[in-house]
Amino acid sequence: MNKPLFIALDYDDQEKMWLFLNQLKDKQGLHVKLGMEMFYQYGPEIVRDLSAKGYQIFLDLKLHDIPNTVKRTAHQLAALGVYCTTVHALGGKQMIQAAKEGLIEGTPAGKPVPKLLAVTELTSISEEVLKNEQHCSLNLADEVKSLAHQAQEAEADGIICSPLEVKAMKSEFSDDFMFVTPGIRPKSYQKDDQARVATPGQARENGSTAIVVGRPITQAADPQKAYEEILKDWSKNDAK
């Protein structure tokens, strides 16, 4: 899939995760996102187990520390053979560059280097929070754009941002720079704790490279049907 749909496996127990995954068809090569909760509970072994079954893994740990620590951590993550992983863009260019170096150095010979994605502003962040709690003088769109340019200069492969911010800035970046967007909700689904959301089709039209979808699939009465409907909306213009 050239423009992946990552299913967010936001569970607190791996038995629940496997129960969900076993409800899906065509699991070989399926793109999934594994976050902090599962990784911190089960460690690298859960990544190896998913990888052994053919899943393409987005390991979302949002690293944010001094450059040397991030580099050494990225070196370890690269050995797991994940598709991509994340750092916080707010960690600065030196930290992002260190993460990239760690991934390159830690990737086994003959294997692809995991893609490095920089998280800009979380999709739970509103204009009010940015101004009143983070004390940022820029509006959200400009802040995200600034962090995106910083990430590109630091040789990240792409960014994580809201689907609402992609359209206005995509033309300023190279074609291979990735815009991975969570905050994806079908029209019939409530926003829950996400402040900046779009439908899969809207994200595609705005220029998203990949989308991340969790609860609308994992909590659906029929996960396979929900996945297929979201994938259809996300992929509807592929033939054009």
UniProtKB/Swiss-Prot annotation:
Entry function: Catalyzes the decarboxylation of orotidine 5'-monophosphate (OMP) to uridine 5'-monophosphate (UMP).
Q: Which UniProt keywords apply?
A: Decarboxylase, Lyase, Pyrimidine biosynthesis
Listed pathway(s): Pyrimidine metabolism; UMP biosynthesis via de novo pathway; UMP from orotate: step 2/2
Superkingdom to which the source organism belongs: Bacteria
Q: What is its EC number?
A: 4.1.1.23
Gene of origin?
pyrF
- Record PROSITE patterns: OMPDECASE
Kindly name one Pfam family recorded for this protein. Answer: OMPdecase
Example GO BP:
'de novo' pyrimidine nucleobase biosynthetic process
Q: Which reaction does it catalyse?
A: orotidine 5'-phosphate + H(+) = UMP + CO2
Any one GO MF annotation of this record:
orotidine-5'-phosphate decarboxylase activity
Q: What class of enzyme is it?
A: lyase
**NCBIfam families found in the cross-reference section:** PRK00230.1, pyrF
Report the active site residues.
K62 (proton donor)
The regions listed as transmembrane in this protein's record are none
Its GO CC terms are: cytosol
Decide whether keyword Protein biosynthesis is in the record: no
**Database matches in CDD domains:** OMP_decarboxylase_like (cd04725)
What the record says about family reads:
Belongs to the OMP decarboxylase family. Type 1 subfamily.
Q: Where does substrate bind?
A: 10, 33, 60-69, 123, 185, 194, 214-215
| Name of the featured protein | Orotidine 5'-phosphate decarboxylase
